[in-house]
Design a protein with these regions (language model features):
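Charge-dense, helix-prone N-terminal extensions
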Residues: 1-121
Length: 121
């Protein structure tokens, strides 16, 4: 999967928009971060230049199991490691599994929205 395929997949979910939220920070890595939002809440982000991993929300009960099963899934850098995981591309995590995890992340965020926010999607 390349950055355009990944981006297209993330944008395929209802109510999703993208933004590069750190255009003025000093370090280039942060400036190149593309975030995917639903109702202004992040569910996924990725560096568009390096495209080595994505960081996504994850059910805390599943996080440890996933990290045990795949070497390409690690605690979410630089986020709260209880609720976020980093999923590395081109390692042992199949593209279909990455898509499943991104979809789960989207669902976690949607479930956290208010009823009014969900109705506006």
């Amino acid at each position: 999967m390349n950055i355009e395929e990944f981006r297209e997949y993330c944008l395929s979910f209802k109510g999703v928009h993208e933004k590069m939220p750190f255009p003025n920070v000093p370090d280039k890595y942060s400036r190149d971060v593309l975030c995917f939002y639903v109702a202004d809440k992040w569910f996924c982000f990725v560096n568009i230049e390096i495209f080595d991993f994505c960081c996504i929300k994850c059910n805390p009960d599943e996080s440890g199991e996933l990290q045990t099963e795949y070497t390409g899934i690690r605690p979410g850098w630089p986020m709260n490691k209880k609720y976020w995981i980093s999923v590395y591309f081109n390692q042992d995590v199949p593209d279909e599994k990455i898509k499943e995890l991104v979809s789960n992340s989207y669902d976690i965020v949607v479930k956290s929205l208010t009823k009014k926010e969900r109705e506006m999607l």
